[in-house]
Amino acid sequence: GCNQTEKAMSNSKITVEVWSDFMCPFCYLGKRNFEKALERFPEQSAVNIVWKSFQLNPNMVTNPNISTTENLAKSKGWTLEYTRQMSNHVTQMAAGEGLLFDFDKAVVANSFNAHRLLQFAKTLGKGDELKEVLLYAYFTDGKNTDDDETLFALAAKIGLPEQEAKN
């Protein structure tokens, strides 16, 4: 009957795998939207989120001297004005979700090392925390998330063991 179904639901876990990249604004927006939906889900404690690593551009060369806006314009063959309009639209979408994006401050960074750190953080049950601080550091603070010192500081911020994080 119904009670058996309810009991089965309360004992089972729902695993949601999320494939995303730290340099993708829509991944950050999707994360926030998913979290808001999860807050309304009566069985949210039964949901296990597994962050998977996906690089949108594995060949991206880190360049802290160019903004993501400039890089996107160059890579797509768009004008800087058009790219800023696109970025402003995404920034407004983010603001609607309580996020602050600054594409002119965000730097072009290969996300491989950030993903390596995420996989390590997951082994210590800190994947969710690291995911959030990395996205915030990239989109809001304009941090170079391919820089070792930046990654170590973010790891320390959420309590990851320093020496292990450096490996």
Go through each PLM region and give its residues.
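C-terminal cap of thioredoxin/glutaredoxin-like
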Residues: 5-6, 11-21, 26-43, 47, ...
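Structural alpha/beta surface segment adjacent to cysteine/selenocysteine redox centers
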Residues: 32-138
